Structure formats: structure tokens, C-alpha cells
Amino acid sequence: MQTDLSDSSFFNHQSVMTDEIMASLEHYPLIHNNQLKGIDATLGGGGHSYHLLRKYSDLNIIGLDQDPFARKSASKKLDEFKNRIDIRASNFADFVPKEKVSFVIADLGVNSNQIDDPKRGFSFQKDGPLDMRMNPFLDVDADKLIEALNEKDLANLIYKYGEERLSRKIARKIKLDLKENGKYSGTKELAYSIAGCFPPKQRYKKIHPATRTFQALRIAVNKEIEVLEKFLQVVPEWLLPGGIISIISFHSLEDRLVKSCFKNDQRLKNLTKKPITPSEQEIELNKRARSGKLRIAQLN
């Protein structure tokens, strides 16, 4: 993928559950004191950080993102707060803060601009290269991944990360296509091939039959589960006593990990027995918010 950072036209991400994130930080006992410091572990377009910096005039935030397009967009959005926002090129699992902070927020998964930009290859709504890398400098994209894996490993990946019951049939079809026809021309051709693995009556449902497989490939390319597991292990060490960690997830694999961590990590007090979900009003305004789940924990 050619990385042209001059094109930010697709980066118009609408942050999810902003009010709920703001409210979650009120659990921190010193939230209204001076010299607050926090980490936005998934900066994206800077939406959550923007609202936090506006509300808390003494707040300083470190914003992390591995996507250079996101960092450029966030830098523009947050320009008025440039003395209080420190944007870092980092995957959140690899970051090591120099000092402890009052809170950490994370909005997991792919964001709207990555989906909407066909050049990123995350979606089959518009044709694009089979890429799916959140960090465009990673070595392995989706195209290389499906070519490198054997049929069994590809099937296991689709089942594990996509929870797709037809994983074996889909993997067999993908490997057969690659053998007989060479590489796929793009996302639409792969999605069409996957859809052909389903009975005709299932091909035209509300959710496209390729959705779960695309999710699985995206998770694998970006090592999303491994990265989240590592992040959940280290993030309590980033917090001051009483500090807050707020995480929004968008699919069951992520949510189960966050739920388990907040429930079982002895360093944390789980503040959400059940996840907080978006309001009906927000879902009406932003359909992509509907699957969001917010969980909150506090350092003991």
C-alpha cells in the first residue's frame, strides 16, 4: 500500500459513546484536581481526547495510534490543545509510559475511516486491495496472509476469529481460487467468492456472508487479540491509585477478554458488572455505534 499522508479526506471518524467515556472518569477521586494526566490508547481521529481536553482545562493527554493517517487527522483536530496533547506513533500494547496516569481509555477495533477508505482494504462495500493493515508499515497484509496459510490453518483462523461455521468450506474455496486463478483482484472478488460458499437463501441477508471472514482476516493481520491480551496485562501498571481504565469493544472476542480481565485481575475493581451500551439516540445518529460495549475498572 502506498502511504500518502496528504490524503486525509477519508478520515472523518465519529467517536462512539463519548458521554459515557466522560462519565466513567468521574469515578476517579481526583478527577477535578489540577495536573491531570491520561492516556488515549487508541487516539483515532482524536474525538474522545478532544472532548476530554475541552472539559478538563488542566488535563494533559498522551495519544497513541499506530495508524499514521489517524495521527495526522488527530493532530489537526486537536491543534488548539497542542500544548496538552502528546501524540505518539505506537501500538498501545508496546507503549511504556514514563509516569503513571489518572486514566486510560481505549476504543478497540477498526474505525470508520479505515472502513470507508477503499484503499485500506478493510471493506467489500467498495473494491480495494486486500490489505487490512491498521499500521500500513506492517509486513503482512491480508493478501499475503491467505496465500501463506495452508487450508487447515486458514480454516482454523476463520473459525477462531470470525466464529464462522462454514470456515472449512470457505478456506477450501479460497485456496482453490488462489491455485487455479492466482491472487484475488481485490476485496469485492474475495467477498463474492466467500458468498458462493453459502446456500442461495443466505447470500442476501442483512449481514453479508463474507462479514465474519473479513473480520477474522483483519484480526489476524493486526494481531488484535494478542495485542489486547498484552495490553490488559500491563495497563493496570500505568495507573495511579484509584485510576480508571475504560474500554469500548465491538465484538464478542474482545468483550470476553475485557470482561474476564476486569473480573479476575486482583489489581482492579470491576465497576461494570454488565457493559454500558450506546443510547438509542446515538445509534440513530451513528449506526456503527450499535455493537459498542463499554466496561470500566478502577485500580485498587
From Swiss-Prot:
One of its GO terms (biological process) is rRNA base methylation. It comes from the Bacteria. GO terms for molecular function: rRNA (cytosine-N4-)-methyltransferase activity. It is an enzyme of class 2 (transferase). Its EC number is 2.1.1.199. Specifically methylates the N4 position of cytidine in position 1402 (C1402) of 16S rRNA. It holds the Pfam family Methyltransf_5. This is Ribosomal RNA small subunit methyltransferase H. One of its GO terms (cellular component) is cytoplasm. It comes from Prochlorococcus marinus (strain AS9601). Gene3D superfamilies: Putative methyltransferase TM0872, insert domain (1.10.150.170), Vaccinia Virus protein VP39 (3.40.50.150). It is found in: Cytoplasm. Keywords: Cytoplasm, Methyltransferase, rRNA processing, S-adenosyl-L-methionine, Transferase. It catalyses: cytidine(1402) in 16S rRNA + S-adenosyl-L-methionine = N(4)-methylcytidine(1402) in 16S rRNA + S-adenosyl-L-homocysteine + H(+). Belongs to the methyltransferase superfamily. RsmH family. S-adenosyl-L-methionine binds at G46, G47, H48, D65, F92, D107, Q114.
